[in-house]
Amino acid sequence: AETQAEVKRMLENPDKTELIECFYKDLEFGTGGLRGIMGAGSNRMNIYTVGAATQGLANYLNKCFKDKGQISVVVGHDCRNNSRKFAEISADIFSANGIKVYLFEDLRPTPEVSFAIRHLGCQSGINLTASHNPKEYNGYKAYWDDGAQVLAPHDTAIIDEVNKVTVEDIKFKGNKDLIQIIGEDVDKVYLDKVHTLSIDPEVIKRQKDLSIVYTPLHGAGRTLIPVSLKEWGFENVHCVPEQMVKSGDFPTVVSPNPENAEALSMAIELAKKIDADIVMASDPDADRVGMACKDDKGEWVLINGNQTCLLFLYYIIKNRIATGKMQ
């Protein structure tokens, strides 16, 4: 009914630009999956385009792993409008095709979705997210059994399968017996694994009072990042309260890209108020980080991705030299 109403509105509009844009082609399933504006039409993110992508992936999984036991997948999603609906529809379609589904109970960071695929021994997984794109967008990322995005030869083979699917082929009626809800059980294992990556826990102990301002920009980072920082030993973590609220409308930012100064404005404002040492922000699916710190004049400046990477690399090399692991 919702789709019919939207199409009817476009048909009745004398200006057919929107109608043409929504239907003039199929939303392309590429090597990274799907990404596009949400709405009715073959060139939009909706239950039918998401359904076709899931049906195509299910068909390919059943071809690849036929006679190899129960096939399973992980399904995750971010905070975006319709992400949960798309995730539940995808879970139904996978299960209707005989595939066991581990569906996260709520939004989770993309890295945890990748981890869960390996931890649970799944053959594939998907995450419903459009990363840091504006609120009108949503997306569909596909992963293989190693937790990484699908690579050759599977990527093009999946694309071929998706392109064969018609609306009539999509099995929307799920099998609830094959859908298992996951959440805190996987969170704990994931955070335990993340904490083993600490290069020198003693450094954290010495810097436990480091004043950190964090914002998830309304996204999935809110579920794990604050608790992870505290479990690691940082005792002075301050979250931007208005941006800890889950919302696909991203009401406090123009665009939820943590590398944009505008998106960090509220976090920097809080940092100035409490005299923090560093600002951290994550995008809606928490696989991209933006950072800011004070320069030698005490002014807050953004650290871009390249600079952040260099700082990490410098610290790793410095630590390995100090511990005799590198010359």
Where are each of the predicted segments found?
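Glycine-rich phosphate-binding loop of actin/hexokinase-like ATP-binding domains
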Residues: 126, 138-159, 289-318
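Generic secondary-structure signature for well-ordered alpha-helical cores
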Residues: 12-16, 39, 43, 55, ...
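Gly/Ser/Thr-enriched, mixed-charge loops and adjacent short helices
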Residues: 18-22, 26-27, 138-263
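N-terminal small/polar loop signature for handling phosphorylated ligands or for N-terminal nucleophile
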Residues: 74-137, 235-291
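A glycine- and small-aliphatic-rich helix-loop capping segment at beta-alpha/alpha-beta transitions
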Residues: 89-97, 120, 141-149, 227-235, ...
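Proline/glycine-rich low-complexity loops and linkers
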Residues: 105, 165-186, 295-327
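Well-ordered alpha-helical segments embedded in enzymatic catalytic cores
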Residues: 49-56, 112, 189-193, 263-266, ...
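An N-terminal, well-structured beta->alpha segment
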Residues: 1-90, 180-209, 220
